[in-house]
C-alpha cells in the first residue's frame, strides 16, 4: 500500500517524539511491504517563528494532500505573550477545522506493566482499563448559537446554546460503532436525556443508527453524571463511550487520568473521508525539550491508530502495540513512567527498543 503522511512536529519535544514515530512507521513499511511518503510542515510556535502565522496556508494544503497527519506537540512559554488567534494553539484548532475533523477518539488503556501508576484500588485495576472515548468535536454547546453576554433586568447575563442536528449525531455514532467493531463490540452512549431535549434527540438517533446499521454491536445508554462515577468505580465495564462535545471533553480527560500514565496515551481526530489527525494527548514539555528525556510511546501508539483508522491495517497496528507492550514488559521506562525496578532509558533508546520488536 502507498501512504502519504504529513508530519507536523511542532514545538518543545515535538521534533524528538516525531522522529521516533516516523522511524516506527518506516519499520512497519519495510516489514509489511508498504510505501510511505512523508511531507514536513510547520504548525504552532515553530510556524510563528518562521512565518508569523501558527497555521500557514502551505501547512493546510500539505495536510489536505496527505492521507493522514501525524502531530507532535504545540505551544510553550516563549509564545505566552501572544493572544487569541496568534497563539500556537490556534494552529491546532485551525487544522482541525480546515480538515473537517468532527470525531475525537481517545483510548485510555492501562498497560498491566504500569498498573502501579494507577490511583484506583488494586481490585479495580485488576479488572483492566481499556476504554475508548469517542467525542463529537464540532457541535454542541461550544459552537451553538446564540452565545454571548447581555444585560437582562439590569443584570449581566451570559448564555450558550447546546445544539445538535440528527446528521451530526448519526455520523459520530457511526464512528463509535465502527470503532467498537475493531474492539470488544460494545458502545455506551452518554447523554443527559432525563433533562435535555438535545440529549433526547441524541439518544433517539444513536438508537436508530444502531438498529439500522450496527445490530451486531452491543449498545447501552448512560446519563453523564452516572458515567463519570462509573469510570472510576469500574472502568472495565466500558469498551467504547460515545458522547457530545461538552460531556466528551470532561469524560475523555477523566478516562485518561485514571490510567496514571498520560505520557502513554494517543488520540485520533477523524472527519468524513479526508485525512485524519493523530497525536499524543500530552503537551510540548518545553522543560525537557532537546534532552532526550521525552517519552515517545504516545506518539508511537498514535501511529498505530493511524495504521488502523486511516489505512485499515489492523495487523500492522497490532504489531506496533505489541512491540510497545513487550518493551514495557521487559522493564524499560522513560522518566515519566519510571517505577521501582525499571530500567531508565531516553527517548531515542525507547524508540530503538520498540523498533527492534516490531
UniProtKB/Swiss-Prot annotation:
The record marks 142, 192 as: Important for catalysis. Its cofactor is Mg(2+); Mn(2+). Mg(2+) binds at residues 225, 249, 253. Gene3D superfamilies: Isopropylmalate Dehydrogenase. GO terms for molecular function: 3-isopropylmalate dehydrogenase activity; magnesium ion binding; NAD binding. GO terms for biological process: L-leucine biosynthetic process. Pathway: Amino-acid biosynthesis; L-leucine biosynthesis; L-leucine from 3-methyl-2-oxobutanoate: step 3/4. Keywords: Amino-acid biosynthesis, Branched-chain amino acid biosynthesis, Cytoplasm, Leucine biosynthesis, Magnesium, Manganese, Metal-binding, NAD, Oxidoreductase. Substrate binds at residues 96, 106, 135, 225. The keyword Ribosomal protein does not apply. GO terms for cellular component: cytosol. It comes from the Bacteria. NAD(+) binds at residues 76-89, 283-295. Catalyzes the oxidation of 3-carboxy-2-hydroxy-4-methylpentanoate (3-isopropylmalate) to 3-carboxy-4-methyl-2-oxopentanoate. The product decarboxylates to 4-methyl-2 oxopentanoate. This is 3-isopropylmalate dehydrogenase. It comes from Oleidesulfovibrio alaskensis (strain ATCC BAA-1058 / DSM 17464 / G20). The gene is leuB.
Amino acid at each position: 500500500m502507498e501512504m502519504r503522511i504529513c508530519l507536523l512536529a511542532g514545538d518543545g519535544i515535538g521534533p524528538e517524539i516525531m522522529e521516533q514515530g516516523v522511524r516506527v512507521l518506516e519499520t512497519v513499511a519495510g516489514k509489511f511491504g508498504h510505501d510511505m511518503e512523508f511531507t514536513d510542515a510547520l504548525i504552532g510556535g515553530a510556524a510563528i517563528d518562521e512565518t508569523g502565522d501558527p497555521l500557514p496556508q502551505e501547512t493546510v494544503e500539505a495536510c489536505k494532500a496527505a492521507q493522514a497527519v501525524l502531530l507532535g506537540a504545540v505551544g510553550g512559554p516563549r509564545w505566552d505573550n501572544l493572544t487569541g488567534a496568534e497563539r500556537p494553539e490556534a494552529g491546532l484548532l485551525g487544522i482541525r477545522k480546515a480538515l473537517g475533523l468532527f470525531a475525537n477518539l481517545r483510548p485510555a488503556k492501562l498497560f498491566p506493566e504500569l498498573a502501579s501508576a494507577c490511583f484506583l484500588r488494586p481490585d479495580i485495576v485488576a479488572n483492566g482499563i481499556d476504554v475508548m472515548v469517542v467525542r463529537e468535536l464540532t457541535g454542541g454547546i461550544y459552537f451553538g448559537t446564540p452565545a454571548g453576554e447581555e444585560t437582562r433586568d439590569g443584570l449581566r447575563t451570559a448564555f450558550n446554546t447546546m445544539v445538535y442536528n440528527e446528521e451530526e449525531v448519526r455520523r459520530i455514532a457511526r464512528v463509535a460503532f465502527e470503532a467498537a467493531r475493531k474492539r470488544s463490540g460494545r458502545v455506551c452512549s452518554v447523554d443527559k436525556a432525563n433533562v435535555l431535549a438535545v440529549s433526547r434527540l441524541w439518544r433517539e438517533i444513536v438508537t436508530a443508527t444502531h438498529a439500522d446499521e450496527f445490530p451486531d454491536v452491543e449498545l447501552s445508554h448512560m446519563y453523564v453524571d452516572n458515567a463519570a462515577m462509573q469510570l472510576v468505580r469500574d472502568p472495565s465495564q466500558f469498551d467504547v463511550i460515545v458522547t457530545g462535545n461538552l460531556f466528551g471533553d470532561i469524560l475523555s480527560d477523566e478516562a485518561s487520568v485514571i490510567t496514571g500514565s498520560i505520557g502513554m496515551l494517543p488520540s485520533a481526530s477523524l472527519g468524513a473521508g479526508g485525512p485524519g489527525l493523530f497525536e499524543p494527548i500530552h503537551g510540548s514539555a518545553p522543560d525537557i525539550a532537546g534532552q532526550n528525556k521525552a517519552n515517545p510511546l504516545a506518539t508511537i501508539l498514535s501511529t498505530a491508530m493511524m495504521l488502523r483508522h486511516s489505512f485499515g491495517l489492523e495487523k500492522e497496528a497490532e504489531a506496533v502495540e505489541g512491540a510497545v507492550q513487550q518493551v514495557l514488559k521487559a522493564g524499560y521506562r522513560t522518566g515519566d513512567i519510571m517505577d521501582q525496578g525499571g530500567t531508565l532509558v531516553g527517548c531515542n533508546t525507547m524508540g530503538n527498543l520498540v523498533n527492534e520488536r516490531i
